[in-house]
């Protein structure tokens, strides 16, 4: 797994692409200022310390996609600990100036979604998009936005995920991402990828959940070959970020999880 120093050596180019992407997404939309930072009670964390620099202006923000779950508030899984650990990793591993706190984003909240070029959705095997959410997400992605889906496992959750995703893109196929795709080489050369398990690995010893025995790297492309949706099926990158500071969670999984996330972020900023 080799490291490409393009982000460390030439951050200006990356940021110029980012600002152009941000402008493209917001173009021809009614102007709406980004929502201020806001917190929500999570499934796992009801209260979490806010970093002292949370209000500082930054170049990139971890935007977490809010949705209605079929059972409970699945969108808050790992939130906000996972988000803040990943933002800190972005600061350390690149010259991208990441905000220290995340931003929950709802597709139905006016045009706010267009302010956030990179979205992360967790446990999407439990979501149930409305027609309005699906239409807004489709428009956002076709305008240049990027959506990373993570932490869902097995056949049953895949079927739930695709039922809503087909409302977003009824005619666009979900395909396996080839090994030579730029997303696997944006910063790190990720030729040696393996299944990244959730915290359940610590007491089961299994890297898989349900019948999700094999990690699948899938996506949806636009007409120009840009990856719009990156689908991390049968893996839990969010847990690898969340538990990165716990000695019990194997370092090799957190290391790969951060590298995948950084690649996906830099790819989104440069495509």
Where are these regions (language model features)?
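N-terminal secretory signal peptides that target proteins for export/translocation
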Residues: 1-4
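Core RNA-modification/binding signature centered on pseudouridine synthases
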Residues: 7-8, 28
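Bacterial N-terminal signal peptides
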Residues: 9-22
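Residues embedded in well-ordered secondary-structure elements
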Residues: 16-19, 51, 219, 253
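Aromatic-Pro/Gly-enriched surface loop or interdomain linker
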Residues: 26-118, 122-125, 228, 236-239, ...
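An acidic, glycine-rich "communication" segment
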Residues: 32-42, 46, 70, 157-238, ...
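Helical hinge/lid and interdomain linker segments adjacent to catalytic or ligand-binding clefts
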Residues: 76-162, 167, 196-205, 232
């Amino acid at each position: 797994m080799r490291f490409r120093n393009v982000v460390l050596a030439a951050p200006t180019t990356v940021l110029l692409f980012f600002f152009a992407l941000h402008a493209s997404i917001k173009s021809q939309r009614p102007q709406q200022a980004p929502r201020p930072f806001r917190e929500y009670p999570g499934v796992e964390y009801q209260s979490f310390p806010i970093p002292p620099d949370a209000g500082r202006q930054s170049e990139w923000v971890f935007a977490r996609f809010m949705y209605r779950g079929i059972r409970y508030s699945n969108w808050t899984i790992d939130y906000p600990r996972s988000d803040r650990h990943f933002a800190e990793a972005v600061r350390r591993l690149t010259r991208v100036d990441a905000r220290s706190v995340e931003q929950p984003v709802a597709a139905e909240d006016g045009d706010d979604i267009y302010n956030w070029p990179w979205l992360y959705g967790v446990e999407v095997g439990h979501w149930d998009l409305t027609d309005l959410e699906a239409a807004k997400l489709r428009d956002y992605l076709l305008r240049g936005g990027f959506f990373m889906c993570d932490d869902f496992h097995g056949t049953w959750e895949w079927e739930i995920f695709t039922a809503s995703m087909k409302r977003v893109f009824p005619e666009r196929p979900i395909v396996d991402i080839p090994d030579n795709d730029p997303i696997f080489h944006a910063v790190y050369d990720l030729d040696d990828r393996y299944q990244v398990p959730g915290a359940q690995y610590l007491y089961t010893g299994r890297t898989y959940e349900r019948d999700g025995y094999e990690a699948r790297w899938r996506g949806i492309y636009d007409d120009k070959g840009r990856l719009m949706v990156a689908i991390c099926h049968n893996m839990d990158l969010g847990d690898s970020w969340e538990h990165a500071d716990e000695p019990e969670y194997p370092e090799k999984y957190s290391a790969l999880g951060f590298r995948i996330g950084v690649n996906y972020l830099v790819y989104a900023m440069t495509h």
